[in-house]
């Protein structure tokens, strides 16, 4: 018997059975335990969710801005009240350490919802004078029914990042979580209903991207799709969304981000930043700075500092608050990461740390991979070119600033980048030349609600968070008013 039994769909403010008996398993990657049997939505369920969302959206959009704001703020309060419970469930479902989920996942998701709840009354149009007898005014109106498709690494946080601006702007959202980590998104739906969100305004459909995701992206009455995931899948989602009914899209996709350490940098601080940029959340963060560039003359000293820090990582049971590095999200993903590690060895990179699956003692039943650092890497290696989405750092040496900027930009991705230096002029000079949408100077990884996040090149389209994202969930209606006479040419 699974610990959490059978998980149903969430449609029209309540849990409902899917149209078929098909289910998939939610697995604890730390132990292999089956946590739940999750129902698979059918195409008929998608239609029910769309109809429910259309009804609810009309009610939601008709509310005043302050009414919507109060309901979203109430949801924030409930999220914070239930923080520890939700964090524990997220840890079981994702394998992320409780020391992370308790202080980051729900906290930062609630922060984003609170941010947009405060912006609801600020959605305004413009008044544009034409002449004494005529003017134009604009209205920012909600799109209608939108879709969010989440990734498996930050399930509830991503659901909040996508739903917060959508709901704030007066839309409804149908959310499809990753098949790998579906449990906390269903809890979020409960919380929205408890807070007073009209039925249907936030529905959750569980199932595969190939089926449920496609039915949603191709549905003619969906107005926008916001997707987080890999670039290859993102291109398919974007093509499906645009070819079916010219839907608007936001794509937060993959990355292979560079971290450039300059010769004048504080090497201890740079090593700390590199560790966070590679091993936080067991390396499963889209913005990870996995290509670490270090001046050739500093490479040996930097390697020593990294090895010292890797040795301090506390790998273990993610439910233990002393653990700061848990398993990977699934056994299938573990095998994928291990295949990249094997490729790195084959292509001549030197293993500085890790490089294998952990199987002793409590690790035997879980999807644990040792924090891995490769050095003596070159730009043409597979581990340097392709997104691994695991705890694998590649150290590369360089000689000149011009060279490292060119090499940092030599990638199809452009999600994130960072620079470590004590020279403020150099910091901005380099950052301004890097082709990336999210950049840090002497830091890595923080993504506050106020900060727009998204990528260049193959790393995405549009932005999440920040004021600008709210506008992406509205459309402008322009109205000309004539107060004087009207002259016809006929």
UniProtKB/Swiss-Prot annotation:
The residues that the entry says bind NAD(+) are 150-152, 176-179, 230-233, 254, 286, 387
Give its E.C. classification number: 1.2.1.8
Could you tell me which pathway this protein works in? Answer: Amine and polyamine biosynthesis; betaine biosynthesis via choline pathway; betaine from betaine aldehyde: step 1/1
Top enzyme class, one word, equals: oxidoreductase
Quote the record's cofactor note. Binds 2 potassium ions per subunit.
Keyword annotations: Metal-binding, NAD, NADP, Oxidation, Oxidoreductase, Potassium
Q: Name one GO molecular function term.
A: betaine-aldehyde dehydrogenase (NAD+) activity
Annotated catalysed reactions: betaine aldehyde + NAD(+) + H2O = glycine betaine + NADH + 2 H(+)
Q: Which residues carry this modification: Cysteine sulfenic acid (-SOH)?
A: 286
User: How is the quaternary structure described?
Assistant: Dimer of dimers.
PANTHER family found in the cross-reference section: ALDEHYDE DEHYDROGENASE-RELATED
Protein's UniProt name: Betaine aldehyde dehydrogenase
Task: Specify the species.
Answer: Pseudomonas putida (strain GB-1)
